[in-house]
Regions:
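Catalytic cores of RNA-modifying enzymes
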Residues: 1-202
Length: 202
């Protein structure tokens, strides 16, 4: 859990959320980031898979009428329907402090489904952040770098030291932002996206 009080306001501010916006949060934990989102957005929907956390969130988020908890697995829930039902035509930003072991699957699901979201601001392990944000053609770039660059413009915002968490992890974290493209920067031959990604992963 994040215990540094300065981190979550920076994440929420970086997401550009304000009046008229919706925020989709993945993994609210005990609600530290959630509270900052609720102070800025018209509505915040948090997806949480851990069934132990709803009682805690019910207490920590009691004063926020614009908060809704969805007890689901973000990799399985129907995100398109959820976004349409909860946010309508509001601009939506995604914010999350992602578990390191599941960073890529969650990000790629959010991007590959071409959901109506403006940006994704997440905290991940620093090494993962560097891979996700590596420019295509550089030595650091890998398949995930090319995949992310197809769907969004990534940037590394700031790093977060282990002491900002309890318990403290053994690695440094980083906050990144993916500004989702309205149209991809390249067009696959014959519009074959699946073929393009097979080539990327080869």
């Amino acid at each position: 859990f994040i215990i540094n009080p300065g981190i979550c306001p920076r994440i929420a501010e970086a997401a550009g959320i304000g009046p008229g916006w919706g925020a989709l949060e993945v993994g609210p934990g005990i609600g530290v980031l959630t509270e900052q989102l609720c102070k800025r957005a018209d509505k915040v929907v948090s997806i949480e898979v851990d069934k132990r956390l709803p009682p805690i969130l019910a207490e920590t988020m009691a004063e926020y009428e614009n908060f809704k908890l969805v007890l689901e697995d973000v990799l399985k829930v129907d995100l398109r329907t959820l976004l349409a039902e909860e946010f309508g035509d509001k601009p939506v930003a995604v914010c999350a402090n992602l578990p390191y072991y599941i960073t890529s699957p969650i990000l790629m699901r959010l991007l590959e489904e071409k959901l109506p979201i403006r940006n994704i601001t997440v905290m991940v392990q620093k090494e993962a952040a560097q891979r996700l944000c590596a420019a295509p053609g550089t030595r650091e770039a890998g398949a995930i770098s090319y995949a992310v660059a197809y769907y969004a413009k990534p940037k590394l915002l700031f790093t977060v030291q282990p002491g900002s968490f309890y318990p403290a992890p053994k690695v440094t974290s980083a906050v990144i932002q993916l500004d989702v493209h309205t149209t991809p920067p390249v067009t696959p031959p014959n519009g074959d996206e699946a073929g393009l990604f097979r080539l990327i992963r080869a």
